[in-house]
Swiss-Prot record:
Gene Ontology, cellular component aspect: cytoplasm
Pathway the protein acts in: Purine metabolism; IMP biosynthesis via de novo pathway; 5-amino-1-(5-phospho-D-ribosyl)imidazole from N(2)-formyl-N(1)-(5-phospho-D-ribosyl)glycinamide: step 1/2
Binding sites annotated in the UniProt record for Mg(2+) 2: 139, 292
Localization terms from the record: Cytoplasm
Alphabetical UniProt keywords: ATP-binding, Cytoplasm, Ligase, Magnesium, Metal-binding, Nucleotide-binding, Purine biosynthesis
Catalytic activity: N(2)-formyl-N(1)-(5-phospho-beta-D-ribosyl)glycinamide + L-glutamine + ATP + H2O = 2-formamido-N(1)-(5-O-phospho-beta-D-ribosyl)acetamidine + L-glutamate + ADP + phosphate + H(+)
Active site residues of this protein: 66, 117 (proton acceptor)
EC identifiers of the protein: 6.3.5.3
Species, as recorded: Mycobacterium tuberculosis (strain ATCC 25618 / H37Rv)
Similarity comment: Belongs to the FGAMS family.
Chain residues that bind substrate: 116-119, 138, 264, 336-338, 564
Protein name: Phosphoribosylformylglycinamidine synthase subunit PurL
Residues the entry annotates as binding ATP: 69, 113, 524, 561
Length: 766
């Protein structure tokens, strides 16, 4: 447990600023709070004295890896360096704010962000996942937006590992319980199983919010005399030290047991009321600046608001409503109790602000005010326990240039190619391979998980189930909508971090494009092992550069993101897992492209893009041989842009009736998923001379399966030829068939495919 949570409730002497100045040699447990020797010395230099116990707690959480980005900041600057003015044109808020905000036209803006809650979700899976959803939702609320949807990227240990059942069950129930209670549709995501995540599951939650552009709010405190109001839930002992104890350190042999008190406890019904309360406060023009309380609690909210503003701030910490008796100042300041917000309000609007809160039965208290100075001063029953320059807490923490070194094992890993593995040749062998992949935890149906989420609440979900990207209607009068997708591949990123990050970007970009939407912006969550490992830092720096360069090539900006380090147990790190989220815009959701076949009688099936013999890092290599080595598929971002442009035009002109991107499992998996989604069979005729195994199972990037109405085949083929996009006819949709047939090789009934796919997760977790 956190040293903060172990401090006595009552001490003989309150450690005030005055007391600290007169007791310079008093021992302090800075190491237990996660601070290094040089960091503690720097705090003393900043203050000109030793810090009080409360100041020490504040600096320790705000200078943690989770809050300060001290190991990643120097590398994350590359995102800004590679973002052109043209890419910035549509951004209303970017990196550094609670969430990025993008202009989508017609006066509308969309804010979206993905964040991790990995470590808490291993310690206490239900609350860890639930509060992960709650935290990202409040980030979106703090921008002035109404949250409209969530997504999740989940990584667990092997499906048959004993602890995976505990973690998955809690995480899925936590996500569903919180999101469903908020009335937010869960419109997509991804679930991956790999032994490397056994002690370090990844729970990355994304939230999307919508606002009118004039309703944008930012996190800053300005105007001397303006009041600071804390509103929402009471403050308790839950979550204390979460950012420094859980999110900024590795698990040891003791695992999670000693860290349980650091997990927050969520109340989705309080948050649901808080959303409506915030929206009414915004509509009434009652808020100058606002910040949610997440990691580091009031330490973060007060220091960031003051640092981003043009003055100082005073806080009466004993005014904070508590739900635990005899909390110390440090505990109140660092508590991560959920469902709380902090607003800057003009004195003339305080009564109106409090009246709105009373209407919604939201507890609200004036706890301080903005000053014309340059200090953040916090008192406890009239005595000063914090007196610091806020920028040194929030924005000028330590920045490290960690050692970076390509792992000695990388060459051997890349030389271990999958070409040595035995491949299926006959029709029976190919059929068995298809069923083996479909019946593995890696490619089986996720219905067991997704059916625990409400996908269509609020009535604006247009695409969710079976779709590559989730789609929402934003404006009922015009049909304007958005599409969102998140993707990652730790296996590819291990083989080549630069290319792996670009492959994740390319797939998320392509998943948005196949819905008919135009990709416009990116968010990310970078999940890696310990930054103190030079090999991990090499993976991280390569992935950042790959993602930034890829966004520059595609012409879409990174609007914000999150870094999660220390995802390892002892010396065993997770696969490097950069999660990429892409936002797209569509002018009318009625022209969306679904995944399922059979919308039109006798559709022609066409494969767009080039197929190469690329199996290194593939699901086929993983399932059939437990192999991971070689080089990932080639990334061609110019081809991805071309593919997206063709799909957008085809959607606008009604040339395509269904589309599905090709990724894990290749063409065979895409065909099966589209056939099952449409409950319609099809007949595949492979091009003469093609290697059936390569064409069916290769994971080459930049490819899409499309269904084209018979009447539009020549037009669509002509458009592809005119733009230089390879398009090959590979079969037809057979509405009278109940099977997927690969002519001359094998056939599998839809019933067998569905049974194989849907039986897997219930077998492990039901």
């Amino acid at each position: 447990m956190s040293p903060l949570a172990r401090t006595p409730r009552k001490t003989s002497v309150l450690d005030t600023v005055e007391h600290a100045a007169t007791t310079p040699d008093q021992p302090q447990p800075y190491g237990e709070l996660g601070l290094k020797d040089d960091e503690y010395r720097r705090i003393r230099q900043i203050l000109g004295r030793r810090p009080t116990d409360t100041e020490l707690a504040m600096y320790s959480v705000m200078w943690s890896e989770h809050c300060s980005y001290k190991s990643s900041k120097v590398h994350l600057r590359y995102f800004g360096e590679t973002t052109s003015d043209e890419m910035r044109a549509a951004m209303l808020a970017g990196i550094g704010e609670n969430a990025g905000v993008v202009d989508i036209g017609d006066g509308w803006a969309v804010t979206f962000k993905v964040e991790s809650h990995n470590h808490p979700s291993y310690v206490e899976p239900y609350q860890g996942a639930a509060t992960g959803v709650g935290g990202i939702v409040r980030d979106i609320m703090a921008m002035g937006a109404r949250p409209v949807a969530v997504m999740d990227q989940l990584r667990f240990g092997a499906a048959d590992a004993p602890d995976t059942r505990r973690v998955l069950d809690g995480v899925v129930r936590g996500i569903g319980g919180y999101g469903n209670s908020l009335g937010l549709p869960n419109i997509g995501g991804e679930t991956v199983f790999d032994p490397c995540y056994a002690g370090n599951p990844l729970v990355n939650a994304l939230c999307v919010g919508v606002l009118r552009q004039e309703d944008l709010h930012l996190a800053f405190a300005s105007g001397a005399g303006n009041k600071i109001i804390l509103f929402g839930a009471r403050t308790g002992l839950d979550g204390i030290g979460g950012v420094s104890v859980l999110a900024s350190d590795t698990f040891d042999a003791e695992g999670s047991r000693k860290k349980l008190p650091s997990v927050q406890v969520g109340d989705p019904f309080m948050e649901k009321v808080l959303i409506e309360c915030c929206l009414e406060l915004y509509a009434g023009g009652l808020v100058i600046g606002i910040q949610d309380l997440g990691g580091a609690g009031l330490s973060c909210a007060t220091s960031e608001l003051a640092s981003a503003g043009d003055g100082g701030m005073t806080i009466q910490l004993d005014s904070v409503p508590l739900r635990a008796k005899e909390m110390t100042p440090a505990e109140v300041l660092c508590s991560e109790s959920q469902e709380r917000m902090c607003a800057v309000v003009s004195p003339k609007n305080v009564d109106a602000f409090l009246a709105v809160c009373r209407k919604w039965e939201v507890l609200a208290t004036v706890i301080g005010e903005v000053t014309d100075g340059d200090r953040l001063q916090i008192t406890w029953h009239g005595e000063t326990v914090v007196d610091v320059p806020p920028r040194t807490v929030a924005h000028e923490g330590p920045v490290y240039q960690r050692p970076v070194a390509r792992p000695d094992t990388q060459d051997a890993l890349n030389a271990d190619r999958s070409a040595k593995l035995s491949r299926p040749v006959t029709g029976d062998e190919l059929r068995a391979t298809l069923l083996a992949l479909l019946g593995s935890p890696h490619l089986c149906s996720r219905a067991f998980i997704t059916e625990q989420y409400d996908r269509y609440v609020r009535g604006n979900t247009v695409l969710a189930e079976h779709a590559d990207g989730g789609m929402l209607r934003i404006d009922e009068s015009t049909g304007r909508g958005i599409a969102v997708s998140t993707d990652a591949s730790g296996r590819y990123t291990l083989l080549d971090p630069y290319a792996g990050a670009q492959l994740a970007l390319a797939e998320a970009y392509r998943n948005v494009a196949v819905t008919g939407a135009t990709p416009v912006a990116v968010t990310n969550c970078l999940n890696f092992g310990s930054p103190e490992d030079p090999g991990v830092m090499w993976q991280f720096t390569q992935a950042v550069r790959g993602l930034a360069d890829g966004c520059a090539d595609l012409g879409i900006p990174v609007t914000g993101g999150n870094v999660s380090f220390y995802n390892q147990t002892g010396s065993a790190a997770i696969l490097p897992t950069p999660v990429v989220g892409v936002l797209g815009v569509i002018d009318d959701v009625r022209r969306r492209i679904p995944t399922g076949l059979g919308a039109e009688p006798g559709e022609t099936l066409m494969l767009l893009g080039d197929t190469r013999d690329e199996f290194d890092g593939s699901v086929w290599a993983q399932v059939t041989a437990d192999h991971l080595g070689g080089l990932p598929p080639v990334v061609d971002l110019a081809r991805e842009k071309l593919l997206a442009a063709v799909l957008s035009s085809a959607s606008r002109d009604g040339l395509v009736s269904a589309a599905h991107d090709l990724s894990e499992g290749g063409l065979a998996q895409a065909i099966v998923e589209s056939a099952l989604a449409g409950e319609t069979g099809c007949r595949i005729v492979l091009p003469e001379g093609a290697d059936p195994f390569v064409l069916l199972f290769s994971e080459s990037a930049g490819r899409v399966l499309v269904a084209v109405p018979r009447t539009e085949e020549s037009r669509f083929r002509g458009m592809c030829e005119a733009r230089g996009l390879p398009a090959v006819r590979i079969g037809v949709v057979d509405q009278g068939s109940d099977a997927v047939e690969v002519q001359g090789l094998f056939a599998v009934s839809l019933a067998e495919l569905r049974a194989t796919s849907e039986a897997v997760l219930p077998r492990y977790f039901g």
